[in-house]
A protein has these predicted regions:
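Sec-dependent bacterial lipoprotein signal peptides
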Residues: 1-18
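Metal-centered catalytic cores of metalloenzymes
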Residues: 19-81, 85-163
Length: 163
């Protein structure tokens, strides 16, 4: 995992040192790193009984958001993953970044991991980029992985800034 996380950080650093948003305002190029520990006990409004666990690393550099999500123990029928906005402790929040599942999820289910990158203003965002960055920076976001057995989410963890 450490080599993948390092590769993720290097990639994020190479993508852009200084960027500007759609309004021409320069966005600081300070690397920000957030992590989340994923488990069923973190699911809301009701915890999920599961042996599945995982972790996520999300980096922000300028207007570039990069993620790596790893499943640390087996999870069955993984179908989706997202960064959500916390609505309240007992309520699921809106999807802000969709990890775009597909063939990559079979790799995550065996512990390989899923990575991706999105730029502020990119059409793959589920919400405007500025609000997405704000909710991550303000500690109001979480990573959630969904399965066929638990379509509302099987493992979840709040993103916490570590750098």
């Amino acid at each position: 995992m450490h080599s993948r996380a390092l590769a993720l950080l290097v990639t994020a650093a190479l993508v852009g040192v200084a960027c500007s948003d759609d309004n021409g305002v320069t966005i600081p190029a300070e690397l920000e790193i957030y992590t989340a520990q994923l488990n069923g006990a973190n699911e809301a409004p009701t915890a999920v009984t599961t042996t599945a666990t995982g972790h996520a690393v999300v980096t922000i550099l300028g207007n570039i958001v990069t993620w790596q999500v790893d499943v640390d123990s087996p999870i069955d029928s993984l179908i989706a993953g997202h960064i959500h906005r916390h609505a309240a402790d007992s309520v699921a929040g809106n999807v802000r970044v969709d990890f775009k599942p597909g063939s990559a999820w079979s790799a995550a289910a065996t512990g390989q991991g899923v990575t991706g990158t999105v730029a502020l203003g990119d059409t793959t965002l589920a919400a405007p980029g500025d609000s997405m960055l704000a909710i991550i920076r303000e500690g109001r976001s979480y990573v959630n992985l969904h399965t066929r057995a638990n379509p509302g989410g099987e493992i979840r963890g709040t993103l916490v800034r570590v750098q």
